[in-house]
């Protein structure tokens, strides 16, 4: 893990409550901690001039959606991002999807879900229940985009939006 990632990760508060969507008030407590962690991550990214995603959720915090973007050669590539919180959360990490990239890379599952099994899922398992959505973005989606998006651009598979 590079120093930039380590410093970004240290700035994201850890979650303390082990709760999933079925856990009532405990889930609401965890959801509050997740929002605080996401806000801290976004503020840290903006301060570091590395702002790259925007997220919101339904009222129960079980369906998340937003935008993420990547700059390549001074051109912005923007994508819809979405995921559901699994019933077994936080033991099971959310499966983050970029639907418009579905089928465009081998490192993706059906529906545009990005492949995180080799690198991120073991890290998530070791850090359950401390990791949350902000950690999944910092250690999962961010590195995935850093590898996959430039490759897709260079191959001419994706184009910037007009």
Curated annotation (Swiss-Prot):
Keywords: Ubl conjugation pathway. The keyword Cytoplasm does not apply. One of its GO terms (biological process) is reticulophagy. One of its GO terms (molecular function) is UFM1 transferase activity. The active site is at 115 (glycyl thioester intermediate). It comes from the Eukaryota. PANTHER family: UBIQUITIN-FOLD MODIFIER-CONJUGATING ENZYME 1. Belongs to the ubiquitin-conjugating enzyme family. UFC1 subfamily. Interacts with uba-5. E2-like enzyme which forms an intermediate with ufm-1. The intermediate is formed via a thioester linkage. This is Ubiquitin-fold modifier-conjugating enzyme 1. The lineage of its organism: Eukaryota, Metazoa, Ecdysozoa, Nematoda, Chromadorea.
């Amino acid at each position: 893990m590079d120093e930039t990632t380590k410093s970004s990760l240290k700035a994201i508060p850890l979650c303390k409550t082990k709760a999933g969507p079925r856990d009532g008030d405990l889930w609401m407590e965890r959801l509050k901690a997740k929002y605080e962690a996401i806000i801290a991550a976004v503020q840290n990214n903006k301060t570091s001039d590395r702002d790259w995603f925007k997220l919101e959720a339904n009222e129960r915090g079980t369906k998340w959606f937003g935008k993420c973007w990547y700059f390549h050669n001074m051109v912005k590539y923007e994508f819809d991002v979405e995921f559901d919180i699994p019933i077994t959360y936080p033991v099971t990490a959310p499966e983050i999807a970029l639907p418009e990239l579905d089928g465009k890379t081998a490192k993706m599952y059906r529906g545009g879900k990005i492949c995180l099994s080799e690198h991120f899922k073991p890290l998530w398992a070791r850090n359950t229940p401390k990791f949350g959505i902000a950690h999944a973005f910092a250690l999962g989606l961010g590195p995935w985009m850093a590898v996959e998006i430039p490759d897709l651009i260079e191959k001419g598979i994706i184009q910037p939006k007009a």
